């Protein structure tokens, strides 16, 4: 389901186009408000942060009886699709002449509105290189380029691996982390002592994960690279996990059903390694990790992978704290129901999957209704979704 910004926000964007993220061609993406506008009084005298807070307070007051009982988690939307990232790979054409991103394109940096350029200019001045503050990198290609087609992202000698590249990527990723910090800080104040868990979600940008530059992750805001000549090996997700730890929040992530081999070899996809990296960071910082499936899949290979990932590895708590072995997930959400799932064969497979989740992962606290396995029905699955830590969603 796609829910656009309210009309009054879109109208404000006509008066202040820098309210939205902007790419190198000047195309503005109205999917969400730019993080650089967080504290700009551009919405009838109020800032976006003011309006986010007003919405949260209204939600809290409206559902105060359900908080801590029916409603136990507040997932804070921090960007496109509710994810803490830049809209570097827009799946919908947001301007008539704008390029339509397609997998496995590397995407584009989204830092060309006036507020972001002002922030970049200030950072460049502080770094002693005012010449770096005029714009983003000039050799990054377009939405659908591949890393080796660009000067910035190419495997060897790419300018991502330079003093300038390190500066720019550090600034770009830090601005994203700071936005997540602001959002969680505000949410924590609104919902303090209400019996709910806070959570944010990172995007599963797994394409080009297995190349040195991690190009698609960089444009999305995750400075996650292998070591180069100027750039050290970076864990681009640890800063986000630290923010979660600071605010007592859970980290939600996707790709739980994926194998690397599900994807074309030439895309250098690494969903398994990416998932492990983020789970390991959560384990080291003692941050609860919640997973979900990325795609609409009802096959046995996907079910087996979900169960394996949810169960974790071993039972050595010290190795869990070190991140060398992965603890069980705190929660799993099964997404993307459709009519296919409720066909007799597919639903029987799903019923068995839910039963295995109960028996093999410890994430289910309830049986499948009060019926025998042969009698389990769609109503019983609904009961599981409302009474357990495995969530079922659309």
Go through each PLM region and give its residues.
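Polysaccharide-binding and catalytic clefts of secreted carbohydrate-active enzymes
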Residues: 5-242, 249
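Substrate-binding cleft of secreted/luminal carbohydrate-active enzymes
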Residues: 236-394
């Amino acid at each position: 389901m796609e829910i656009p910004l309210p009309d009054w926000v879109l109208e404000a964007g006509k008066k202040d186009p820098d309210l939205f993220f902007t790419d190198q061609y000047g195309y503005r993406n109205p999917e969400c408000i730019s993080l650089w506008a967080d504290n700009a009084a551009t919405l009838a005298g109020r800032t976006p942060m003011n309006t986010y807070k007003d919405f949260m307070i209204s939600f809290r007051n409206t559902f105060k009886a359900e908080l801590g009982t029916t409603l136990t988690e507040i997932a804070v939307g921090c960007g496109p699709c509710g994810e803490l990232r830049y809209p570097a790979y827009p799946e919908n054409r947001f301007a008539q002449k704008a390029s339509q991103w397609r997998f496995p394109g590397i995407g584009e940096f989204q830092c060309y509105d006036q507020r972001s350029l002002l922030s970049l200019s200030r950072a460049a001045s502080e770094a002693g290189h005012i010449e770096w503050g005029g714009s983003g990198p000039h050799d990054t290609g377009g939405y659908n380029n591949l890393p080796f087609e660009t000067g910035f992202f190419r495997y060897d000698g790419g300018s991502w691996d330079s003093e300038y590249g390190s500066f720019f990527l550090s600034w770009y990723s830090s601005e994203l982390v700071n936005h997540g910090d602001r959002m969680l800080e505000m949410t924590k104040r609104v919902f303090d002592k209400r019996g709910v868990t806070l959570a944010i979600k990172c995007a599963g940008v797994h394409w080009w994960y297995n190349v040195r530059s991690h190009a698609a992750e960089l444009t999305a805001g995750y400075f996650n690279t292998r070591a180069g000549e100027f750039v050290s090996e970076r864990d681009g997700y640890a800063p986000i996990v630290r923010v979660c730890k600071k605010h007592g929040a859970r980290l939600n992530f996707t790709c739980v059903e994926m194998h690397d081999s599900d994807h074309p070899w030439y895309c250098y996809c690494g969903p398994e390694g990416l998932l492990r990296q983020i789970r390991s960071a959560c384990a080291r910082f003692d941050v609860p990790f919640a997973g979900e499936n990325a795609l609409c899949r009802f096959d046995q290979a996907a079910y087996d992978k979900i169960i394996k990932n949810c169960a974790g590895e071993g039972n050595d708590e010290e190795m869990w704290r070190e991140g060398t072995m992965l603890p069980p997930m705190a929660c799993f959400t099964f997404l993307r129901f459709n009519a296919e799932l409720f066909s007799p064969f597919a639903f029987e497979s799903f019923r068995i999957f839910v039963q295995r989740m109960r028996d093999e992962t410890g994430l289910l606290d309830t049986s499948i209704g009060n019926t025998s396995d042969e009698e389990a029905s769609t109503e019983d699955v609904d009961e599981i979704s409302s009474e357990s830590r495995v969530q079922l969603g659309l």
